[in-house]
């Protein structure tokens, strides 16, 4: 109201034993990142913008946890959801500036083991198995998950990936109708299949299996996420939340 803005997270969930609690600096960063990206371009992004904003963060909540709460993944989650909540609140006043301030990413399926071609230990953080950014905005369709990762990390090709690790990339493609329907369609998700060519172990955590990327300003939600280890075998594992040191044999397929 007037020349001030109150952002109140009262009612947020309590802090969690998991590693997605958001520290105060992370929470503030997402609040002001969202605010800065949605207001008029003529307004300088400096201390004068931040000073009239009052932020209320309940102590002991997921947005302001008591130490020593784990916060390792808060850069994405619950950080992304914090940005999303602020964007939804501002959407009512400036709908044309609203867009998805979130990434339903979790983490890539990270594998590690001994490369039989070199005899050396390796860790493969495969960002090809990540999707969920470059979403729709006013006047623009989402453009999917093939651009650089957050605009900061260029994705390697499947061929380059296969040259460096004991795997075979069997395919990577957009999933039809996975973007949220609307006047401007949301960004499409991808389906990636990678076959292990040697024994290895996999780590991952998955989000967006229940709550997908949300639509804005009348747009509909996108599709949910799915990660499958050892697809099509008796030991097939659909990852519900996390997978830790999950063994993959030569020939096993990972789908994400």
Which residue ranges define each predicted feature?
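Glycine/proline-enriched, intrinsically flexible loops and inter-domain linkers
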Residues: 1-256
């Amino acid at each position: 109201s007037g020349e001030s803005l109150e952002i109140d997270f009262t009612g947020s969930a309590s802090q969690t034993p998991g590693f997605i609690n958001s520290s105060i600096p992370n929470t503030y960063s997402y609040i002001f990142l969202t605010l800065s990206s949605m207001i008029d371009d003529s307004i300088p992004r400096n201390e004068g913008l931040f000073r009239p904003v009052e932020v209320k963060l309940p102590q002991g909540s997921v947005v302001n946890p008591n130490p020593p709460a784990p916060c390792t993944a808060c850069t994405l989650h619950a950080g992304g959801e914090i940005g999303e909540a602020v964007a939804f609140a501002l959407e009512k006043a400036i709908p044309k500036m609203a867009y998805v301030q979130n990434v339903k990413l979790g983490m890539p399926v990270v594998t590690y083991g001994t490369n039989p071609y070199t005899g050396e230990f390796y860790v493969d953080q495969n960002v090809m198995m990540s999707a969920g950014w470059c979403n729709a905005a006013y006047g623009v369709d989402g453009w999917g998950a093939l651009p650089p990762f957050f605009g900061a990390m260029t994705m390697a090709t499947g061929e380059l990936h296969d040259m460096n690790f004991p795997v075979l990339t069997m395919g990577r493609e957009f999933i039809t109708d996975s973007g949220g329907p609307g006047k401007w369609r949301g960004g499409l998700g991808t389906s990636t299949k990678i076959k292990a060519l040697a024994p290895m172990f996999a780590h991952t955590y998955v989000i967006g299996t229940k709550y997908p990327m949300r639509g804005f300003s009348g747009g509909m939600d996108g599709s949910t996420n799915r990660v499958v280890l050892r697809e099509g075998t008796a030991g097939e594992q659909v990852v519900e939340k996390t997978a830790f040191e999950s063994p993959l044999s030569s020939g096993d397929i990972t789908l994400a």
